[in-house]
């Protein structure tokens, strides 16, 4: 896939809407943070030092050992414009930090976008694996094999006592950040979500919005991840996250059953109102779109709205974002223009689906 196609293609592997528990778990993500010994952290590096890190990382990515498993294409942040960077953020392929603050940053992408390797973000290397559904172990297996290939060629910053050294203290140790993106509309509707979020903080996990730290949980989407890596093994981190996520999944299912059994008419009314608005509205702002799409997604998962694939809703999560809308238009848009284009895009996509029924 060409660099241009990564920006224009609305589809990523994680949007498939398949895999274990995919009615609730939109995606699973694993990140591994690594730094190179005798190289300043990216925040302190000069341009030439940062360029040297990119060169070393891309040499390994082009090696026979890596190419046997993954064909990766490098995109340099200083060679793409702000809208293109924003599209990559909205597709969850790079972090806002790499897009906005990194000096001489780059990302290496696999064609199906399930693997992305950020270079010169907060750390020299951040390996990301992003899969559809609840697939922590599979994400770990892919990520650790990539990490092994890098470690054979690069001299990692590692301390026998502390583990892998990272720029952020919360990543020191294993350097692993695992997360699952959960769609929890029923827990929000039944007003149980606050209690659950408070309990999560007490077991070493944290909940953020869909774009990570500081972002809002739009469309009833919550990102659950481990908070620290020091003093815990990789298996401990993954098993703890798996266990808590499994409990939340079951509680969401119980809440959905309750809504169906006790408030079915009002639930269906809410779902079909949102579906109708998305089918016919002429303008829709981003927060409303996220909420309406959440309602429709719930209707699909409960069988209330038939013959619509979750893939369509996952795709719209990205294509209705400001960056993608503007990049697709080929120009910057005012908020009103974005709202109009967003509504038109949703109408067209849903009508294509209806015509295929």
Swiss-Prot record:
GO MF terms, alphabetically ordered: ATP binding; creatine kinase activity; protein kinase activity
Catalytic activity: L-arginyl-[protein] + ATP = N(omega)-phospho-L-arginyl-[protein] + ADP + H(+)
Residue interval(s) of motif RDXXRA motif of the pArg binding pocket involved in allosteric regulation: 338-343
GO cellular component, one term: extracellular space
Domain of life: Bacteria
EC number: 2.7.14.1
Annotated positions binding ATP: 27-31, 92, 126, 177-181, 208-213
Pfam families: ATP-gua_Ptrans
Phosphagen kinase C-terminal domain location: 24-255
Listed GO biological process terms: phosphocreatine biosynthetic process
SUPFAM superfamilies on file: Glutamine synthetase/guanido kinase
Enzyme class: transferase
Keywords, sorted A to Z: Allosteric enzyme, ATP-binding, Kinase, Nucleotide-binding, Transferase
Regulation: Appears to be allosterically activated by the binding of pArg-containing polypeptides to the pArg-binding pocket localized in the C-terminal domain of McsB.
Function of the molecule: Catalyzes the specific phosphorylation of arginine residues in proteins.
HAMAP family for the chain: Prot_Arg_kinase
Family note: Belongs to the ATP:guanido phosphotransferase family.
Name the record gives this protein: Protein-arginine kinase
Organism: Brevibacillus brevis (strain 47 / JCM 6285 / NBRC 100599)
Designated gene of the protein: mcsB
């Amino acid at each position: 896939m060409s660099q241009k196609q990564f920006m224009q293609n609305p589809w990523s592997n994680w949007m498939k809407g398949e895999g274990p528990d995919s009615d609730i778990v939109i995606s699973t993500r694993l990140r591994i943070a690594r730094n190179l010994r005798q190289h300043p952290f990216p925040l302190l590096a000069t341009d030439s030092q940062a360029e040297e890190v990119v060169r070393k990382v891309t040499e390994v990515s082009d090696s026979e050992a890596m190419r046997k498993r993954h064909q990766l294409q490098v995109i340099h942040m200083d060679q793409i414009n702000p809208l293109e960077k924003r599209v990559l953020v909205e597709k969850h392929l790079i972090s806002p930090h790499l897009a906005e603050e990194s000096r001489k940053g780059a990302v290496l992408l696999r064609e199906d976008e399930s693997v992305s390797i950020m270079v010169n973000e907060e750390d020299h290397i951040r390996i990301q694996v992003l899969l559809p559904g609840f697939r922590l172990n599979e994400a770990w297996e892919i990520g650790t094999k990539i990490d092994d290939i890098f470690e054979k060629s690069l001299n990692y910053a590692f301390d026998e006592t502390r583990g892998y050294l990272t720029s952020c203290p919360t990543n020191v140790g294993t350097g692993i950040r695992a997360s699952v993106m959960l769609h929890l509309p029923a827990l929000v509707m039944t007003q149980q979500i606050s209690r659950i979020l408070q309990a999560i903080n007490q077991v070493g996990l944290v909940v953020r919005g869909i774009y990570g730290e500081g972002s809002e949980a739009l469309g009833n989407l919550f990102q659950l991840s481990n908070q620290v890596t020091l003093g815990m093994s990789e298996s401990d981190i993954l098993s703890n996250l798996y266990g808590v996520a499994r409990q939340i999944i079951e509680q969401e299912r119980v809440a959905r059953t309750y809504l169906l059994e006790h408030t079915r008419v009002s639930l269906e009314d809410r779902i079909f109102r949102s579906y109708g608005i998305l089918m016919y509205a002429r303008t829709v702002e981003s927060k409303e779109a996220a909420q309406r799409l959440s309602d429709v997604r719930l209707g699909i998962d409960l069988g209330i709205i038939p013959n619509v694939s979750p893939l369509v809703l996952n795709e719209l999560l990205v294509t209705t974002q400001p960056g993608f809308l503007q990049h697709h238009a080929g120009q910057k848009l005012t908020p009103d223009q974005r709202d109009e284009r967003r509504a038109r895009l949703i109408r067209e996509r849903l009508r294509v689906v209806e015509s295929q029924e």
